[in-house]
A protein has these predicted regions:
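N-terminal targeting peptides
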Residues: 1-176, 181-192, 196-200, 207-210, ...
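Residue-level detector of the short coil/turn that links helix A to helix B
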Residues: 151, 185, 220, 254, ...
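Alpha-helical solenoid repeat scaffolds, predominantly canonical TPR units
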Residues: 123, 159, 193, 228, ...
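Pentatricopeptide repeat
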Residues: 102-106, 136, 140, 156, ...
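The canonical alpha-helical register within tetratricopeptide repeats
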Residues: 126, 162, 196, 230-231, ...
């Protein structure tokens, strides 16, 4: 195996039909408005970089064969050759292995070789000889993406030319190009790639436009996406997805004012559409996190609801979290009814837990219990958090008749009571004169928690003694000693008083001997 070399060494793909990119790759004939936009944005970008301190480019994190479990030996060997061999030697080393590859093998290796673009492209060429140059479209797309993500744009465009000759170009290919340029902070070149894509046989339609806008917005450049849309809409009419992409961009930026403007434009342009859930989802989530919070959000939510338009699960989850923080059960129930009753949007266990916790906090046990019982009908299932919430608040409110069956139910459903709830329960049941439930919980606790049980164990023994249950107190004191749980001398002293008073001195003597030997 050759000596390991720097990542960037010899990055040229050297593929027979991949020529260096020429300026003709940029759009030859832009409309006046588009040309003006590109010129202005380019000048602004140059200005920005001129006055910034030089910075290292964003270095993407690539998937590695080293971190991929259960990788077939052949794939691992090929990846290792690419990662540790000079580009000039890759094909020779591959030949010496005698390995035969399939289209699927090529795809797997390329996906794990982004860190080494030069050798990866050499591998692509080498494997093409075995496959009679019948690489899959996906493998070609991986090469384009691999080159683009390493900012090897000349070679990337040469690969695009080769794909064009083979009739393999698709929107997915250009989506990769857009993403690579944007992630390299070269938005204008992403836009120019969009402008020329029809020259490569790929339609420059609204789906392609949305792909470009999505790449720009994902990188936090929603303002530039919006600016370009104002130009592109002269020839391509935006659709619901266009606005959903922009609104998600404003959501990620936390830009409430821009979100309002885009939402208003959307309603004017395409009207109200019950199917446009992602747009409503992002818009309401943005408002909720804005300065006016729930008040403004509810105003827009009710406007949507009147038109039978609803957001998705993301908004409802964030809104329920807000209601729980502010103990706002009225709004929580209004949203819940809209979500479950009218929108047929199925809440998950986490959302049920939020509402159950809110009702338990406000001491509405009956409503919380109904929510717990209803969960399974909506495809959600209670977990340990659900039961522990119920158990915690029932104990806090001293509603022990309701708490006892909850404990039994959670054990039956293998949802473990947490340590804190077990300790609280033992204390509450002892304080309320119910040693049977206290003992039941203690038995479960010492079988499932192997540490931090000393304090509550001593409390139980003393509590049983105070409830005139001295035989049980002695029994569990002995059991604690046998299990290696420290029995405090103060606990032992109290047992001595009770046993001496009852004329059970020998019982105490036996307990003391056991205690001393441990």
């Amino acid at each position: 195996m050759s000596k390991k070399r720097p990542h960037r060494e010899d990055y040229s793909p050297s593929y027979s039909n991949l020529d260096p990119i020429k300026k003709s790759h940029h759009p030859p004939n832009l409309s006046p408005r588009r040309a003006e936009y590109v010129a202005i944005r380019g000048a602004l970008d140059r200005n920005h970089h001129q006055f910034q301190q030089p910075q290292m480019g964003k270095r993407p994190t690539f998937a590695s064969y080293i971190d991929t479990p259960n990788l077939p030996l052949k794939i691992k060997l090929l990846c290792e050759i690419i990662a540790t061999t000079l580009s000039s030697s890759v094909e020779k080393v591959l030949d010496e292995t005698g390995i035969m590859v399939s289209q699927d093998d090529v795809e797997q290796v390329l996906k794990l070789s982004y860190e080494y673009p030069g050798p990866a492209v050499k591998f692509f060429r080498w494997s093409g000889l075995q496959l009679n140059d019948k690489h899959s479209p996906y493998a070609w797309n991986l090469v384009v993406d691999l080159l683009g993500k390493n900012c090897l744009f000349d070679a990337m465009w040469d690969a695009l030319k080769s794909m064009k000759k083979e009739g393999l170009l698709s929107l997915a290919t250009f989506a990769s190009v857009f993403s690579s340029y944007v992630s390299a902070d070269r938005v204008q070149e992403a836009i120019m790639s969009f402008e020329v894509m029809d020259q490569y046989g790929v339609s420059r339609d609204v789906v392609a436009l949305n792909s470009l806008l999505s790449a720009i917005c994902r990188d936090g450049k929603t303002l530039q996406a919006k600016e370009f849309l104002s130009i592109a809409r002269d020839t391509i009419r935006p659709d619901a997805d266009t606005y959903a992409i922009l609104l998600e961009g404003w959501e990620n930026a936390g830009d409430v004012a821009s979100a309002r403007k885009t939402f208003a434009e959307m309603v004017t342009d395409i009207g109200w559409d019950p199917g446009n859930v992602p747009a409503y989802d992002s818009f309401l989530t943005t408002l909720l996190r804005g300065p006016e919070g729930m008040r403004e959000t509810l105003k827009f939510f009710e406007t949507m609801r009147d038109r039978r338009c609803y957001p998705g699960i993301k908004f409802f989850k964030v809104a329920l979290e807000d209601c729980a923080r502010n103990s706002d059960v009225r709004v929580a129930e209004l949203l819940w009814e809209s979500m479950v009753g009218k929108n047929d949007c199925r809440p998950d266990t986490e959302m049920y837990n939020l509402l159950i916790g809110l009702h338990m906090y406000l001491k509405d046990t009956e409503r919380a219990r109904k929510l717990l019982d209803d969960m399974v009908y909506y495809g959600a299932f209670p977990n340990s958090q659900t039961y522990n919430l119920m158990f915690q608040f029932l104990l806090k409110g001293r509603k022990l008749k309701e708490a006892s069956p909850i404990f039994s139910e959670m054990i039956k459903n293998e949802c473990a009571p947490n340590h804190e709830n077990c300790c609280t329960a033992i204390r509450v049941y002892i304080d309320n004169g119910d040693p049977y439930m206290a003992i039941k919980i203690w038995k479960w606790m010492i079988d499932n928690y192997k540490s931090d049980v000393e304090e509550i164990g001593n409390f139980l023994v003393v509590g049983l003694r105070d409830l005139k249950r001295v035989p049980e107190a002695v029994k569990y004191a002995k059991d604690m000693i046998d299990r290696g749980i420290k029995l405090n001398s103060s606990t032992l002293s109290k047992l001595k008083q009770s046993l001496s008073k009852a004329g059970k001195g020998p019982v105490y003597d036996e307990l003391l001997r056991k205690w001393k030997t441990r």
